[in-house]
Regions:
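C-terminal transmembrane helical hairpin of 12-TM major facilitator-type secondary transporters
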Residues: 270-312
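Juxtamembrane intracellular "pre-TM" segments in multi-pass secondary transporters
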Residues: 179-206
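Cytoplasmic helix-loop-helix junction between adjacent transmembrane helices
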Residues: 97-138
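Helix-to-loop junctions at the C-terminal end of transmembrane segments
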Residues: 55-66, 253-267
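Conserved MFS/SLC helix-loop-helix module at the cytosolic interface between two early adjacent transmembrane helices
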Residues: 53-92
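Helix-breaking motifs and short loop linkers at transmembrane-helix boundaries and internal kinks
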Residues: 34, 66, 87-93, 104, ...
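Paired small-residue
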Residues: 77-84, 92-101, 295-303
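C-terminal membrane-cytosol helix-exit motif in multi-pass small-molecule transporters
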Residues: 164-184, 373-377
Length: 390
């Protein structure tokens, strides 16, 4: 298990590094490319579009030809794309590099869940995903610091060289240590019909559950600077301190989740996760109704972090359960649903004029409704399937 944890950790870190490492250099990139900061920030959406546009194809290739091809290919693409973006002379070339970075990061993102699902039992999978999530929580805190250190010695292009080096290390370690994990295909396993998953009510319900949880955490990340700095008047330094504390809450919860799983079991941990969301809603509503009470707001933020950190790995493991011969395709579908739902939600509520606090509260309510749908409908679906087979 330690070898697979190392390999998959090096796979999944490319996704957040591709987002967080270059943010401190946005003004310098804008000046160098003679672009507006808004154009540079558009590269974030292009990066996510690159991920979403290719993960289905990557999943099908992995299910048909093996996981190593996708892992090594994704790492190589990320290396080359980072160098393209780092040597850009104009915004178009920068966009091109960011798009292909997204392709490489997306391939390695879905392979993280795929490889772990291949080699671990359902119980150990939830624990492993929680541990990986705990390490990943540190990256948004450390990446700006690392970016600042790079900028203190090199220009902004050095950041993309650093991204390329991280991807090269990831590819090399996986080349040397990662063995092929794709299960042998068996007649009648359904491996040739990956789209059959989309007709599975159980899989789609659990996909909605994971997507609603991802939407909640991404909305929290998106609106927290607006709430704290614009509404409460926090300085950049004060905001950074709060985010470091929240990252610590997320990391601590993620590392404690394996113990909770042994003690309570998966279903109770999932219930604790959504109880945290419910308490977060109450805390945020209290802050909102009192005209902005920071002593209610910050515990609400912490509860959002707790809910996501202890529940996401369990929900992902449940969604991938039973997808043994199409697990890479299933991981790709989950990735697309999570990106699409969160992006659509943030865009739609922004267009409708919702305030940042309202957006976060509604996202948490969506997660709670998804959980209630899963708890109410899955037993009924299992009973219906048992009757049809009997």
């Amino acid at each position: 298990m330690p070898v697979f944890l190392l390999c998959t950790f090096l796979m999944i870190i490319l996704y957040p590094i591709g987002i967080d490492l270059y943010l401190v250099a946005v003004p310098k990139i804008a000046d160098a490319l003679q672009a507006s900061e808004a154009q540079i920030h558009t590269a974030f959406s292009i990066y996510l579009f690159g991920m979403a546009a290719t993960v289905l194809l990557g999943g099908m290739i992995a299910d048909r030809y093996g996981r190593r091809w996708v892992v090594l290919g994704g790492a190589l693409i990320f290396v080359l794309a980072s160098l393209v973006a780092g040597h850009a002379e104009g915004i178009t070339q920068f966009y091109l590099g960011r798009f292909w970075q997204g392709i490489g990061a997306g391939a390695l993102y879905i392979m993280t869940f795929t490889v772990l699902r291949d080699v671990l039992s359902q119980e150990r999978l939830a624990m492993a995903l929680s541990m990986i999530n705990g390490v990943i929580c540190v990256i948004p805190v450390l990446a700006p610091v690392l970016g600042y250190l790079i900028l203190s010695h090199f220009d902004w292009r050095g950041i993309f060289v650093a991204m390329a080096l991280v991807a090269a290390v990831s590819g090399l370690v996986n080349l040397l240590l990662l063995k092929e994990t794709r299960p042998a295909r068996q007649p009648g396993s359904g491996a040739a019909q990956p789209f059959a998953l989309l007709r599975s009510p159980r899989f789609m319900l659990l996909s909605l559950l994971t997507s609603a949880s991802v939407t909640s955490i991404l909305v929290y990340v998106s609106v927290s600077p607006l709430i704290l700095m614009k509404e409460f008047g926090f300085t950049t330094e004060q905001y950074s301190i709060v985010m470091m504390v929240m990252a610590g809450v997320s990391m601590s919860t993620s590392f404690l989740t394996p113990l909770l799983l042994r003690w309570l079991g998966k279903q109770k941990v999932l219930a604790v996760s959504h109880l945290s969301y419910l308490l977060a809603v109450c805390s945020l509503l209290g802050s909102w109704q009192t005209g902005g009470d920071i002593h209610l707001l910050l515990p609400g933020f912490a509860l959002v972090c707790v809910g996501f950190s202890c529940g996401f790995g369990v929900a992902m493991g449940e969604a991938l359960d039973g997808c043994q011969h199409n697990v890479a395709f299933a991981s790709a579908v989950l990735c697309i649903m999570q990106i699409s739902l969160s992006g659509l939600y943030i865009w739609l509520l922004g267009q409708l004029g919702f305030t940042p606090s309202e957006m976060l509260i509604c996202a948490l309510l969506l997660a709670l409704l998804s959980y209630l749908a899963v708890k109410g409908l899955l037993p009924w679906l299992a009973l219906r399937e048992a009757r049809s087979q009997g």
